[in-house]
Amino acid sequence: MSENRLGICSTCQKNASKYRCPRCDSRFCCLECNLEHKRLTKCSGERDPATFVPKSKLVNHLNSDFNFLSGVERLINRKENGSHQVSNRAERNRLQLKRSLERAGINIKFAPPSNKKRRLNRTHYDKKSHLIKWSIEWCLHESSTSKDLTDEASENTIITHSHPESEPLEKIFRKLVEENSEMNSQVSKANIHAPDDMQFMIKSRKSRSKGFIYKKIEPSNSLSSCLRNSFVFEVPTIHVFTSTTQVHTESSYETSSSEQSDDSSSSSSCISDSEESSSDDELNELSNEKKANSPTQNVDTSSKLSSVKFQNEDDEDRRKNSDGSEASYSLPPLFGSYFQKQGQY
């Protein structure tokens, strides 16, 4: 009966078909024929929910619609739960990495998942060597002094991976130039010829007057010691300049700021001395005026007090009647006569 209803397999044309493709309604006898059909026709094998269904066959497709909606709900739940679990596992590893780096004196902040550095970052802890292997972003600045140092120089930026934290920075860079063709092309593009004439920097902070202030690192030190007491956003960014390029470093910035503070303190001391002298002169003038005007002021104040005293006594006499009772206050005409008759006022 099934053979008459489904017919012969559409792929092998030999056996009776047992299955039907939900997408294109083709018949198959086994899984191999189904896979061969998908390979030849590029069929996905999934039902198209937007396919037109006649009204006469609408009742028969209710189960398919229900299964489709249930499948969508399961897919959403699986995506939410699966991504949550993966993010928990990934976040747990990243949190452990962050704690170990903070113990080593490296302040790291991870980027959001949509960030490009986050997708390219492969920094991890290697269990075999018991070392952290870094992904490093190299920013190679051109040797021309006309270029603004505040630019990111994105055309000469490359990210490399799997650099042990115990390896010296100079050795890492030399190995990359020799073995990595992309790094070699970026170095030649930046007009950096001799590796010995280079200086390695990390951004420290930004000044309003001088732009970015860089922290100079020693290339002979290990990578972990170079990154100690520095801020890392997802991956460490190491800026490479030639020795002739003038860069605002922390030492030069502190020297200039100390000179400015000395100048400002000297000017402020001069101003304060002049203010003190002027204030002393004013105090002397005020004291002389007080001494000159003190007798007359005492006479005036005593006369004023006596006049106020006599005025208060006159007011009290006016408030009392001849029989010693206090004077009645003026009340509104409607209620005043009544209360006065009662003797309350």
Swiss-Prot record:
One GO cellular component assignment for this chain's record is: nucleus
> What does this protein's UniProt record list under function?
Required for box C/D snoRNAs accumulation involved in snoRNA processing, snoRNA transport to the nucleolus and ribosome biogenesis.
- Asked if the keyword Metal-binding belongs to this entry, the reply reads yes
Q: Where does this polypeptide localize?
A: Nucleus
The name this protein goes by in its record: Putative box C/D snoRNA protein SPCC613.07
Report the leader peptide range: none
Family as reported in the entry's similarity comment: Belongs to the BCD1 family.
Locations of Polar residues compositional bias? Answer: 293-310
Residues of the region (Disordered) are: 245-345
Q: Where are the zinc fingers (HIT-type)?
A: 9-43
Q: Which residues bind Zn(2+) 1?
A: 9, 12, 29, 33
- Gene Ontology molecular function, alphabetical: zinc ion binding
In this UniProt entry, the residues modified to Phosphothreonine are 296
Q: Which residues carry this modification: Phosphoserine?
A: 294
Which residue windows does the record flag with biased composition (Low complexity)? 250-272
Record SUPFAM superfamilies: HIT/MYND zinc finger-like
Binding positions for Zn(2+) 2 per the UniProt entry: 21, 24, 37, 43
The organism named in the record is Schizosaccharomyces pombe (strain 972 / ATCC 24843) (Fission yeast)
Q: Which UniProt keywords apply?
A: Metal-binding, Nucleus, Phosphoprotein, Zinc, Zinc-finger
Give any single GO term for biological process: box C/D snoRNP assembly
Instruction: Give me the stretches of Acidic residues compositional bias.
Output: 273-284
Where does the UniProt entry say this protein principally localizes? nucleus
- Keyword Secreted among record annotations: no
